[in-house]
Amino acid sequence: MEPPRGPPANGAEPSRAVGTVKVYLPNKQRTVVTVRDGMSVYDSLDKALKVRGLNQDCCVVYRLIKGRKTVTAWDTAIAPLDGEELIVEVLEDVPLTMHNFVRKTFFSLAFCDFCLKFLFHGFRCQTCGYKFHQHCSSKVPTVCVDMSTNRQQFYHSVQDLSGGSRQHEAPSNRPLNELLTPQGPSPRTQHCDPEHFPFPAPANAPLQRIRSTSTPNVHMVSTTAPMDSNLIQLTGQSFSTDAAGSRGGSDGTPRGSPSPASVSSGRKSPHSKSPAEQRERKSLADDKKKVKNLGYRDSGYYWEVPPSEVQLLKRIGTGSFGTVFRGRWHGDVAVKVLKVSQPTAEQAQAFKNEMQVLRKTRHVNILLFMGFMTRPGFAIITQWCEGSSLYHHLHVADTRFDMVQLIDVARQTAQGMDYLHAKNIIHRDLKSNNIFLHEGLTVKIGDFGLATVKTRWSGAQPLEQPSGSVLWMAAEVIRMQDPNPYSFQSDVYAYGVVLYELMTGSLPYSHIGCRDQIIFMVGRGYLSPDLSKISSNCPKAMRRLLSDCLKFQREERPLFPQILATIELLQRSLPKIERSASEPSLHRTQADELPACLLSAARLVP
């Protein structure tokens, strides 16, 4: 029996509310509707069903009388049912399944099924497998479809519902996402088009799914559309024609039997594919292969820059581990070509592993890492600093800084090193040449990390050797007695030498001209920077910090969190020059400027 599609023909105007009716809806939901004179059950439940993606054509309503369900027509007046309970259930022949969404973090490479963009945090349906971003939830089909199930079983249910006598047409060539995605309602009719109704689940699947309590409400009202029973008949046309002929095979031949009867019954042989189907299957297989290969691609691939895209303009300088050039790559950049001749496979892999760590560094006092190159040699691309190095300011240009500025440079350097150590990155070559003053007095630390380049290799095994400049080397690094002498404390020693440069304006051991003598005496503990050369206006707290950073035993040196806290406390304790609180006298009258005693004396004069 086809239920009516509209309100009763009496055309009576609804009047005031007289009561309520409790309604139990599908998917274990319930609501309360207001009873109004002149309205039918159809009208009263219309909104409650539409917001849940249902309509009266696919549901049946019961009255609950003494615990028993009694079928009630949709055109029944709602007024006599005041205070009663109604039950709305989905028709048994309507294969409706609700989504079961869960929040998921995709650690393997995944893409949204709708916007086709990278997906990390999102949602996934446990039944049909849809995965999507939260902002793509409006594109999710209203009805859940388990695409992994057998379509043949569903086709039988659709054909039974439509009478089984209709000749089905060829499947549509539209994409599956277009068929499964709800569209806006058509202006010509209040019922949706076939595109609004996705493929339902098979007949043996459960009709209702209980929504998880932890599932967010990603379906808004605008994402749902009412369903028409006629849509189920039209939906069967979008399935493959091999399922259409299986119903005609009534001879009882098994599905997998290769007998001629199975072929003559209208169902194609598994091996007889049309050229169009073969091309479509091949393209789908190629797409899956591309996605699979993309999923196993190393994330460092997106940070490796092709050499043809980088233009080297001018050589800036040469250091211990490479040559720095000014280049162009989407703007001005600094390119450091490292001194690695004929790198082995082990060196190349170690270099790429280190780039994975450096690409995650983001700090105001750290040079921005932008990419790397492995052909023809190892190279690192960083941001371009317009300013000069701290070494150039102190020892070449003789820039004069006041004590407040020097302490601020020391604080920013400690802040940047504290960030690197928090990332478990040891600089290994901290010195004034690698500290840049960018746009005024903003400190930028460069040339950090690079353990692969700063290590001597013997075949596939790295051999530890002293790396860096001699003046900034700690004693344990010079001796090389430990398997790995580089530590956070060795960076602290180098930072202590930088503090010495700031507070004295000169390099340590300037009176010794022999490099080997410096290496021997510092490694033995016979030589240390002369603290008597420190400026007389240097605060005592800075003197003590400088002395602690240059300790011979590395266990006695402080770490950068303690160093940073000490300098910040020192900065707060420095005297501040405050602006004068005096007011200008531009708008005062001459009488206001005179003292009151003079004015009173003037009045007493006869």
From Swiss-Prot:
The keyword Protease does not apply. Residues 19-91 form the RBD domain. Belongs to the protein kinase superfamily. TKL Ser/Thr protein kinase family. RAF subfamily. GO terms for molecular function: ATP binding; MAP kinase kinase kinase activity; protein kinase activity; protein serine kinase activity; protein serine/threonine kinase activity; zinc ion binding. One of its GO terms (biological process) is negative regulation of apoptotic process. This is Serine/threonine-protein kinase A-Raf. Dephosphorylation of Ser-214 by the SHOC2-MRAS-PP1c (SMP) complex consisting of SHOC2, GTP-bound M-Ras/MRAS and the catalytic subunit of protein phosphatase 1 (PPP1CA, PPP1CB or PPP1CC); this relieves inactivation and stimulates kinase activity. GO terms for cellular component: cytoplasm; cytosol; mitochondrion. Keywords: ATP-binding, Kinase, Metal-binding, Nucleotide-binding, Phosphoprotein, Proto-oncogene, Serine/threonine-protein kinase, Transferase, Zinc, Zinc-finger. Gene3D superfamilies: 3.30.60.20, Phosphatidylinositol 3-kinase Catalytic Subunit, Chain A, domain 1 (3.10.20.90), Phosphorylase Kinase, domain 1 (3.30.200.20), Transferase(Phosphotransferase) domain 1 (1.10.510.10). Residues 310-570 form the Protein kinase domain. The modification Phosphothreonine is found at residues 181, 253, 318. Binds 2 Zn(2+) ions per subunit. Residues 160-207, 240-290 are annotated as: Disordered. Its cofactor is Zn(2+). Residues 274-289 have a biased composition (Basic and acidic residues). The active site is at residue 429. Pfam families: C1_1 (PF00130), PK_Tyr_Ser-Thr (PF07714), RBD (PF02196). The keyword Transferase applies. PROSITE patterns: PROTEIN_KINASE_ATP, PROTEIN_KINASE_DOM, PROTEIN_KINASE_ST, RBD, ZF_DAG_PE_1, ZF_DAG_PE_2. It is an enzyme of class 2 (transferase). Interacts with TH1L/NELFD. Involved in the transduction of mitogenic signals from the cell membrane to the nucleus. May also regulate the TOR signaling cascade. Phosphorylates PFKFB2. CDD domains: C1_A_C-Raf, RBD_ARAF, STKc_A-Raf. Zn(2+) 2 binds at residues 112, 115, 133, 136. Predominantly in urogenital tissues.
